[in-house]
Structures are given as structure tokens and as C-alpha cells.
Amino acid sequence: MANHEQIIEAIKEMSVLELNDLVKAIEEEFGVTAAAPVAVAGAAGGADAAAEKTEFDVELTSAGSSKIKVVKAVKEATGLGLKDAKELVDGAPKVIKEALPKEEAEKLKEQLEEVGATVELK
């Protein structure tokens, strides 16, 4: 069995993609998540802090009049192929991306709205 130093050295040599895969494998193997715990700010603000949503789904509700630009923006944002991005846009309302942090979700919403799409954060 490898000692701690050998494990740390092996991790240092990994690429970001390999580290991401390692984290996912550890999460699956041990039934845990690598998400940082959210601290609740005392009893008075506790209910508000717990109720605040931290992850959002970006839903395309309509492609609007410039469908081609929306398809290109969806393709770029999701990494899908052109055909898959077009099918996603044609099937609106559809969730484009799930469980994004608030800033990322708002940025994607802005990008899609700039090209004429109607978008909701859920």
C-alpha cells in the first residue's frame, strides 16, 4: 500500500482533468461530495441563508427571432455538436445547463439574451 507522500506526489503530477476524474471517482466510491459546506450566519439570519438558492438551472424558454445565433450560443455554452444544440433550441422550453453557481448562471443567461433568446433561471 502506498504511503501518504507517494499519494501526494502522484496527485501533483496529475492534470486538472485527471484530478477532476479522481474527485468524481472518490465521491462515487465513498458516497460523499467535494462541495464546501455552507456556513449559516446565526439564528436570526439562519432561515434566510438556508433559503437562499446557490445553484441554478438555466432554461431556454424561447429562441426568439434570431434562432441561428441562439443555436450557436447554446452550442458554445454546452459543448454540444451543432445538431444537438439545434435540437435543444427547437425543443424549448428546455434546460440548457443544470446546477450552475449563481454567477455562472447569470452570465450564461446574459449571453443567451444578447442573441435574442428568452431565458429563465430556476
UniProtKB/Swiss-Prot annotation:
Forms part of the ribosomal stalk which helps the ribosome interact with GTP-bound translation factors. Is thus essential for accurate translation. The gene is rplL. It comes from the Bacteria. It comes from Staphylococcus aureus (strain NCTC 8325 / PS 47). Gene3D superfamilies: 3.30.1390.10, Single helix bin. Keywords: Ribonucleoprotein, Ribosomal protein. InterPro entries: Ribosomal_bL12, Ribosomal_bL12_C, Ribosomal_bL12_C/ClpS-like, Ribosomal_bL12_oligo, Ribosomal_bL12_oligo_N_sf. GO terms for cellular component: cytosolic large ribosomal subunit. Disulfide bonds: none annotated. One of its GO terms (molecular function) is structural constituent of ribosome. Homodimer. Part of the ribosomal stalk of the 50S ribosomal subunit. Forms a multimeric L10(L12)X complex, where L10 forms an elongated spine to which 2 to 4 L12 dimers bind in a sequential fashion. Binds GTP-bound translation factors. This is Large ribosomal subunit protein bL12. Belongs to the bacterial ribosomal protein bL12 family. GO terms for biological process: translation.
